[in-house]
Amino acid sequence: MSTYFDLIMIPLQLLIVFFTIYYFTLSFFGLFGRRPEEKIYDEQKTFAMIVCAHNEEQVIGQLVENLHLLNYSDHLYDIFVVADNCKDNTAQIARQAGAIVYERFNDNEKGKGFAMDWMFQRLFEMERQYDAVCVFDADNLVHPDFLREMNSRLCKGERLIQGYLDSKNPNDTWISGVFSISFWVVNHVWHLAKYNIGLSSCLG
């Protein structure tokens, strides 16, 4: 009986030990910051900033205003908001804040994935074509140098880039604090650590 039990438990324990060592080792490469690199701040790339929003009138205006304040030339990026099956004032508020708004209504295809696919089809048919597309949630806020950093990486030949994710209110409640810790772990143990040793990061 114990032999059959060992046949199950020993491989399982070895698997646990392997992943423990893997994550423990990997985490060290994310604890000491980003590896030194040269940055390119000559503004060369154009961006389409896309926000898919469903009934987000409480936050959409803040994000659009935030995107307009980025440290990057206004003529090099446009802000698009997809008001997806909205029943509130999301579209109106986004327009007033200065976004290019597309309203979408489809009772059968609901959700961010459908909205993004719908918007991408229209984006790629526009007369103006962009070097890159940035996707945001309606409740996001963006660092002023976001596009400068994205431009630098695109100029170096990178094609798919994951930005740094963090919470806006880590000290409000214990729940927001836990989310902040999870963001920190993912950013450093997964994204930054893998980047520092030349591995691919996951999108989140």
Task: List where the protein language model places each region.
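N-terminal membrane-anchoring/stem segments of glycan-assembly enzymes
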Residues: 1-43
